[in-house]
Amino acid sequence: MYNDLEKILLSKDEICERVKELGKTITCDYKGKTPIAICILKGSTPFFADLIRTIDLKLECDFIAVSSYGNKTRSSGEVKMIKDLDNSIEGKDVIVVEDIIDSGHTLSYLKKLLLSRKPASLRICTLLETECRREVPLNPDYVGFKIDDYFVVGYGLDYAEKYRNLPEIGILKSSVYSNK
């Protein structure tokens, strides 16, 4: 798998340290509350699992799955619901946990959908953000790392369902996906 990477962008240690910092900030921001953290499947799973263990609060968890990529490297802009939440978020403080925001289509769709369900508040926490590819206005509340326009894999991020299990985040060689 590592042969398919141009280079490691973020090491396991860098990710771990930043996740701890995000958890401390979220703990302070929600002191005295019981927020519900929503994991966007599948890519956010490792980040979500590590993040919630750093949040020192009573915390509820739920999961949602949407997609705008399929096996492509760029968002199609069309978002498809795959799995909805199991529980109501009405009147609850919601933290949406995402792996990466680039075009913003997926999160914009989700934000509108979730706000229509009348939560007390809704904030977005993303591990990675690439502002240069943003096609819709969207400002996450918590950002792990801002990165340039790379096709990244690892730590939950995939290409065609592969590379999610890498403990680091790496830049995928264009030769791996350019002829697909």
Predicted regions and their residues:
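PRPP-associated nucleotide enzymes
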Residues: 1-180
